Amino acid sequence: MILLFMLSISFMASGASLIVKNGDNIGFLGDSLTQFANREYGFILLVMGALKAEGVKNLKYIPGGVGGDRSNSILARLDKFLAKKPSIVILQVGVNDVSWAKKGVELPQYEKNIREIVARCEKAGARMVLVTPTMHTEDPAFANNVKLEKYAQAVRDIAKEKNIPLVDWQKKMRAVIASNRIPADKGNHLTIDKVHLNGYGNMFLACAILETLGMDKKKVESFIPAWKKIPSMAPILNMWNSPKYRISMDDHAVLYKEAQKNKMTVDAYCRHLIGEKIRELKK
């Protein structure tokens, strides 16, 4: 009886930290990163699959990403998004606010816009999760990334002030790139084109979101082996807006190893293999 009671307490404690509940309707609100995440290998479906595997029932989600969106354009369409009645809103926006030059949004207005988005979502009854903006190129010293760090800090400050769960993707992304532990060519560790996420990028962002939602880190990491087997958008033979060629992260790692032996990028090595095959077929 005592053992059963202790196991019950343990189960309640482990499940109590998950802020997603049965029947939640999770809205993913953002730009093209969020738009493209609504694919088999995208962070949206990875997150939703993990939550369902963890036993959360009757979950729904709203894919609310629009390519090119900035904080002001999200505000302009927010009522339409909220009409779908999300119970949780996961918001990530900012890279276009910085990278769109004259059409971008300066920091004071960006912060004001984020505050208004949060206020309107909460007024509509949604619980918020904030995500710091993604990097623009994988070079931390790039001028836009220096600027983006200030935008990320604004999001951190708002999250802290309002006690909103925070996914610090900007910080996580910089740390993963600096670790140099991804089997990928420089500049494409987490992205396909230095902005839009490849399989690794989607995987790491999904992990960060799930941990912020309260899932145990070891439990989150248990999903990674299966995720690495999903054919995903890789930085080879592709453009971000036409991901017709997909391979799994596991297969990409094999190609990377062979490319390194031949002192080539993975993309160059794949093109080399295609050329060899064509020459073979012509014989």
PLM feature spans:
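Extended hydrophobic secondary-structure segments that form protein cores and membrane-embedded regions
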Residues: Y61-G65
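Residue-level marker of alpha-helix boundaries and capping positions
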Residues: N38, G68, P108, N145-V146, ...
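Boundary at the C-terminal end of the N-terminal hydrophobic targeting segment
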Residues: A13-S17
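Alpha-helical cap/lid subdomain in secreted, periplasmic
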Residues: V20, L45-K60, S73-S242, K261, ...
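Catalytic nucleophile-elbow at a beta strand-turn-alpha helix junction centered on a G-D-S/GDSL motif
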Residues: D24-R39, V66-R70, V98
